[in-house]
Design a protein with these regions (language model features):
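Conserved, compact domain cores that house catalytic/ligand-binding motifs in diverse enzymes
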Residues: 102-183
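Beta-strand-enriched, solvent-exposed domains that form extended recognition/catalytic surfaces
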Residues: 13-103
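C-terminal cap/substrate-recognition subdomain and adjoining C-terminal extension
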Residues: 147-244
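Generic structural hydrophobic/aromatic packing signal, biased to beta-strands
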Residues: 35, 51, 85, 96, ...
């Protein structure tokens, strides 16, 4: 029911012929930028793709037979980076969230944490204000279980939520990959199923649903009281980034 309700209140998303996957890492921790080229609904390999970081060309890559292409990337400075992939007349963008070693992240399962916003303008407003407040002290990582990055991103932007990455939820493996990149996971907010899957990875787990594997909260104000604490961010300098 929830995915249908979400789709009914936002603009439908077309199927792009190029896909850029959002990622999260830390300064000086290498990752592989991942793109996918498609022909209609199916993967289409063997295409040249130009990869740009904030409109600066990093490198040209060739996608494999499965349509996927990769580029090793190491960020020398923190921030939310824009990655654009262009192949012929097709293009798409994604984001890479880069954290300093002392920065902490809060994960938000969008379908689980924001489901009541479909029915209540008041809850939608309180959700937006709470996440914006949390983003002043923590980095926000959004999860999408069913709808995908495109639909979720349009909805978040429409509701003026803080900009950040949107990761596809793949169970505990998603959290393991984040920790492998040295990302400090401070808390997770979402459905009872998601926080149950996170019980071995994240200590602070909150849900608006009944759960035995975390704390059930009544509203976003309660979450703010439990999570809001000062976090000093180091002064950011200008760094150059590199792709290999």
């Amino acid at each position: 029911l929830l995915p249908i309700l979400f789709i009914s209140v936002i603009v439908p998303v077309s199927h792009s012929k190029v896909v850029v996957f959002d990622q999260v890492t830390t300064v000086q921790t290498p990752i592989k930028i991942r793109v996918l080229t498609r022909g209609g609904f199916f993967s289409e390999g063997g295409r040249m793709v130009d990869i740009y970081l904030d409109n600066n060309l990093l490198k040209k890559i060739l996608t494999g037979g499965d349509g996927y292409g990769y580029l090793k990337y190491t960020s020398r400075g923190p921030g939310l980076k824009k990655i654009t992939a262009r192949s012929n007349t097709d293009s798409a963008s994604g984001r890479i969230l880069v954290l300093n070693d002392n920065e902490k992240a809060i994960i938000i399962d969008t379908e689980g944490a924001f489901k009541d916003t479909v029915f209540s303008d008041e809850f939608r407003e309180s959700s937006q204000k709470a996440v914006t407040s949390l983003s002043e002290n923590y980095k926000i990582i959004y999860l999408s279980r069913f709808l995908g990055k495109g639909i979720t991103g349009i909805w978040l932007e429409k509701q003026n939520f803080p900009k950040s990455v949107i990761l596809r939820w793949r169970g505990p493996k998603t959290l393991e990959n984040l920790k492998k990149n040295s990302v400090q996971l401070h808390a997770i907010i979402g459905s009872s199923d998601v926080i149950s899957a996170a019980k071995e990875q994240i200590e602070k787990r909150f849900s608006f649903e009944k759960t035995k594997d975390g704390k059930t909260v009544k509203d976003w104000d309660e979450i703010l009281k439990l999570l809001q604490s000062p976090l000093s961010h180091p002064k950011r300098n200008d760094y150059s980034d590199e792709g290999e």
